[in-house]
């Protein structure tokens, strides 16, 4: 119950027997002291909600679509990871040369070990790709990328002369092949 006050244009509100000064624009939206659900119900038992309120949750499909796109993008990042390493491996292969020393051998070992390790843990990678709709294509791209990395390591081993590709590598009594051309530089004196 409200009554007008003598000064300030405010209103007095009696709530539970105590009078408090209220501003003119204040509106009391609750019924009584308590704010429980039963007090907010009307006399018919209906809940008094504002106009346009609905008890049913509104599904937000834009969030689900954005999540699905994010999962697809993440799965493609995982699948394309080995292919993204190939240009850097080619550059390192070029810079290390074909001589047999500690740096090129370590580089070849790491280049061969990474794809083998990735292929051995492929089941864990496929668990990441299960939520994707293009799971098989992404798995195939992942497999091809790792096989290309292994092929680069094998090629580097062959160019360094570490692979046994001639029969003299296996048998001691066979002479190694002679090189047909020998190139050299410098001035002849």
From Swiss-Prot:
Residues 1-11 have a biased composition (Gly residues). It is found in: Endoplasmic reticulum membrane. GO terms for cellular component: EMC complex; endoplasmic reticulum membrane; membrane. Residues 94-104, 155-189 are lumenal. InterPro entries: TMEM85/Emc4 (IPR009445). Keywords: Endoplasmic reticulum, Membrane, Transmembrane, Transmembrane helix. Residues 1-72, 127-133 are cytoplasmic. The chain crosses the membrane at residues 73-93, 105-126, 134-154. It is a multi-pass membrane protein. Residues 1-20, 30-63 are annotated as: Disordered. Pfam families: EMC4. It comes from the Eukaryota. GO terms for biological process: protein insertion into ER membrane by stop-transfer membrane-anchor sequence; tail-anchored membrane protein insertion into ER membrane. Residues 36-46 have a biased composition (Basic and acidic residues). Part of the endoplasmic reticulum membrane protein complex (EMC) that enables the energy-independent insertion into endoplasmic reticulum membranes of newly synthesized membrane proteins. Preferentially accommodates proteins with transmembrane domains that are weakly hydrophobic or contain destabilizing features such as charged and aromatic residues. Involved in the cotranslational insertion of multi-pass membrane proteins in which stop-transfer membrane-anchor sequences become ER membrane spanning helices. Belongs to the EMC4 family. Component of the ER membrane protein complex (EMC). This is ER membrane protein complex subunit 4.
């Amino acid at each position: 119950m409200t009554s007008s006050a003598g000064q300030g244009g405010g209103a007095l509100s009696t709530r539970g027997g105590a009078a408090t000064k209220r501003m003119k624009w204040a509106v009391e939206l609750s019924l009584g002291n308590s704010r429980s659900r039963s007090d907010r119900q009307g006399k018919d038992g209906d809940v008094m909600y504002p106009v346009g309120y609905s008890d049913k949750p509104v599904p937000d499909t834009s969030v689900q679509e954005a999540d699905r796109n994010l999962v697809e993008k993440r799965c493609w990042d995982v699948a394309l990871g080995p292919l993204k390493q190939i240009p850097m491996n080619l550059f390192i292969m070029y810079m290390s040369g074909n001589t047999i020393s500690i740096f090129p051998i370590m580089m070849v070992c790491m280049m061969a070990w990474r794809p083998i390790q990735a292929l051995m843990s492929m089941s864990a990678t496929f668990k990441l790709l299960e939520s994707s709709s293009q799971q098989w294509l992404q798995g195939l791209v992942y497999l091809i990328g790792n096989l290309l990395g292994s092929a680069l390591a094998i090629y580097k081993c062959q160019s360094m002369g570490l692979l046994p590709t001639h029969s003299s590598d296996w048998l001691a009594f066979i002479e190694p092949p002679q090189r047909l051309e020998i190139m050299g530089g410098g001035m002849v004196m």
